[in-house]
Amino acid sequence: MSSFEDKKTTGITFNIQKYSVHDGPGIRTVVFLKGCPLRCRWCSNPESQRRRIELAYNTGRCLTLTKCVRCVEVCTMNAITRADDDTISIDRALCEECGMFCAEACPSKALITYGTTRTVDEVLNVVEQDSVFYARSGGGITLSGGEPFAQPAFALALLREARRRHIHTAVETCGYASWSDMEPALEYVKFVHYDIKSLDDEKHRSATGVSNVRIIENLRNIRSRFPALKVVVRTPVIPGFNDTEEDIRAIARLTAELEVEYQLLPYHRLGTQKYTFLDRQAPMGEVVLDEQVMTALNAVVAAEHATDG
């Protein structure tokens, strides 16, 4: 596809985060794409899961106590009504992609939208604003999500056009995508963060809603098809799910076999408020991860990779 066609390709993003230092080498701009095939119980970005633009409601900012009903007046779907407690009620079965006039009309920004339709050119024009930092640090653009390959045409066009502009490219993926969508995009990628939650398929299905078979197959495909591509496998350590030496040792052995770096990410509770904004319940509740558990699991990883070396 030509550069002109790639630039006009559109997709839905929910954030563009500048000056990130944890999403690949150097200083990076992370582009978050909406849509994810997994429903991880610990997801800290619930607004990333659905591919469509969504309406969020922060009751703490609402001005209904001052008799403001601008959102009710402009809603074209009759999805918003005033509730008895002087807040508003949103019928999300009726609330669809209607232009989100309610969010535009809300004077206090109690109503906001998660998701913006952008062209590749619009995204990369933002990314290029920090080109001087990339040049000095070895950074660039990272596609994250959600799952970038849930919007395969947009992801491919972004990566291909970024490379045309000499921007270093990275992807953060859960690995659950068709290989036919991943392979052409990976031709334009220099670095991959690859998530593996568990090698126990039954456990994986229970916690994420999908099998891990495709995820493991795609990791092996990447190593065989793109042996020079830098891959770092990461596992979020989740209390009550995979926080055992048995779980982590299994993944550590796989990564040692495939000769890829392996990192553990401690569970955190960031993002729980966003569930409330979307009228959803945060699935994990109040659980916390014991620091001593993380220390022990990191020792397991070090031992397995030391044995491999």
From Swiss-Prot:
Keyword Oxidoreductase recorded: yes
EC number: 1.97.1.-
Pathway(s) where this gene product acts: Organosulfur degradation; alkanesulfonate degradation
Ranges of residues in domain Radical SAM core: 22-309
EC top class, as a word: oxidoreductase
Domain of life, per lineage: Bacteria
The keyword DNA-binding belongs to this UniProt entry's keyword annotation: no
Positions with a binding annotation for [4Fe-4S] cluster 1: C36, C40, C43
Description of what induces expression: Highly up-regulated in the presence of isethionate.
GO molecular function, one term: oxidoreductase activity
Amino acids binding [4Fe-4S] cluster 3: C75, C95, C98, C102
Residue sites binding [4Fe-4S] cluster 2 per the record: C62, C68, C71, C106
Gene Ontology biological process: alkanesulfonate catabolic process
Pfam families referenced in this protein's UniProt entry, alphabetically: Fer4_12 (PF13353), Radical_SAM (PF04055)
Domain called 4Fe-4S ferredoxin-type: residue spans: 53-85, 86-117
Phenotype seen when the gene is deleted: Cells lacking this gene lose the ability to grow with isethionate as the terminal electron acceptor.
Catalytic activity annotation: glycyl-[protein] + reduced [flavodoxin] + S-adenosyl-L-methionine = glycin-2-yl radical-[protein] + semiquinone [flavodoxin] + 5'-deoxyadenosine + L-methionine + H(+)
Cofactor comment: Binds 3 [4Fe-4S] clusters. One cluster is coordinated with 3 cysteines and an exchangeable S-adenosyl-L-methionine.
InterPro entries the UniProt entry points to: 4Fe4S_Fe-S-bd, Aldolase_TIM, BssD/PflA/YjjW, Organic_radical-activating, Organic_radical_activase, Radical_activat_CS, rSAM
Keywords: 4Fe-4S, Iron, Iron-sulfur, Metal-binding, Oxidoreductase, S-adenosyl-L-methionine
Role this protein plays: Involved in an anaerobic respiration pathway that converts the sulfonate isethionate (2-hydroxyethanesulfonate) to ammonia, acetate and sulfide. Catalyzes activation of the isethionate sulfite-lyase IslA under anaerobic conditions by generation of an organic free radical on a glycine residue, via a homolytic cleavage of S-adenosyl-L-methionine (SAM).
Assembly behavior: Monomer.
Annotated protein name in UniProt: Isethionate sulfite-lyase activating enzyme
Phylogenetic placement of the source organism: Bacteria, Pseudomonadati, Thermodesulfobacteriota, Desulfovibrionia, Desulfovibrionales
Gene name linked to the record: islB
